Amino acid sequence: MSAHIIDGKAAAARVLQQVRHDVNILKAEGIEPALAVILVGNDAASEVYVRNKILRAGEAGIRSLEHRLPADSSQARLLALIAELNADNTVNGILLQLPLPAHIDENRVLQAIDPDKDVDGFHSENVGGLSQGRNVLTPCTPSGCLHLLEETCGDLSGKHAVVIGRSNIVGKPMAALLLQAHCSVTVVHSRSTDARALCQLADIVVAAVGRPRLIDASWLKRGAVVIDVGINRIEDHGRSRLVGDVDFASATEVASAITPVPGGVGPMTIAFLMKNTVTAARQQAHAQRSQPEAVCLSTY
């Protein structure tokens, strides 16, 4: 058996095509979606991620504003910038590129972002809303994974999904989205004593642990659909290359479909960042239109 390779680049292109269409509709209504990107320091990987996000925003017709702060910037300075962007009605989405320098409290600054502009979906209001099934901005990577699963499998109702990893960025929101899609969901993690056995029962496996090639064919049920979120850089015969959390070569002999690394989940993350930005712009415009006009009372 040779697995179908899920093309994340092609799927992301389709999402971005719809985003461009939605942006054009908003612009016709006088609304120009805008995304503010904040980068603290000069981490090489973060520089690449920010550059790619700004490039995709431009391609989608979304205005981008890049804010760079030195690595030694104080937390107060970062919070002041976030407050300024929160108050700016021309900014619809705020993205804070992670990781942050060690002296900055990541949770504190993420919670300072207006939930309506939190296009990463990390604010506690959006996290809580997701767990309750409300219509909120959801984390981009899990949203992209769910989209790939629905394109590949169709209706996910009744399928047994195992999420490997319990991070706030991927594992937990992924489990919540799969529950909303009516899957039976199991989350395994570093303290699970029977992770491999549980995965062997799964129709869907989402791997997000950050350990290169941890999941091989022995973890998988024949015919399972595998979404590999991991991005790990390894040395292979003297050369550096990217691999996922799944041993791709062995998994393709058992799985019915699998995402590659690179070219699988990564492009979907950026595509759904753009989708979230357009959603935020639309919702903010609707909220502004719904506000009652001020009534001026003259005194005689």
UniProtKB/Swiss-Prot annotation:
The keyword Hydrolase applies. Pathway: One-carbon metabolism; tetrahydrofolate interconversion. CDD domains: NAD_bind_m-THF_DH_Cyclohyd (cd01080). GO terms for molecular function: methenyltetrahydrofolate cyclohydrolase activity; methylenetetrahydrofolate dehydrogenase (NADP+) activity. Its EC number is 1.5.1.5, 3.5.4.9. One of its GO terms (biological process) is tetrahydrofolate interconversion. The keyword Oxidoreductase applies. NADP(+) binds at G165, R166, S167, S190, I231. InterPro entries: Aminoacid_DH-like_N_sf, NAD(P)-bd_dom_sf, THF_DH/CycHdrlase, THF_DH/CycHdrlase_cat_dom, THF_DH/CycHdrlase_CS, THF_DH/CycHdrlase_NAD-bd_dom. It comes from the Bacteria. Gene3D superfamilies: Leucine Dehydrogenase, chain A, domain 1, NAD(P)-binding Rossmann-like Domain. It catalyses: (6R)-5,10-methylene-5,6,7,8-tetrahydrofolate + NADP(+) = (6R)-5,10-methenyltetrahydrofolate + NADPH; (6R)-5,10-methenyltetrahydrofolate + H2O = (6R)-10-formyltetrahydrofolate + H(+). Keywords: Amino-acid biosynthesis, Histidine biosynthesis, Hydrolase, Methionine biosynthesis, Multifunctional enzyme, NADP, One-carbon metabolism, Oxidoreductase, Purine biosynthesis. SUPFAM superfamilies: Aminoacid dehydrogenase-like, N-terminal domain, NAD(P)-binding Rossmann-fold domains. Pfam families: THF_DHG_CYH, THF_DHG_CYH_C. GO terms for cellular component: cytosol. Catalyzes the oxidation of 5,10-methylenetetrahydrofolate to 5,10-methenyltetrahydrofolate and then the hydrolysis of 5,10-methenyltetrahydrofolate to 10-formyltetrahydrofolate. Homodimer. NCBIfam families: PRK10792.1, PRK14186.1, PRK14188.1, PRK14194.1. Belongs to the tetrahydrofolate dehydrogenase/cyclohydrolase family. PANTHER family: C-1-TETRAHYDROFOLATE SYNTHASE, CYTOPLASMIC (PTHR48099:SF5), C-1-TETRAHYDROFOLATE SYNTHASE, CYTOPLASMIC-RELATED (PTHR48099). This is Bifunctional protein FolD 2. It comes from Pseudomonas syringae pv. syringae (strain B728a). The gene is folD2.
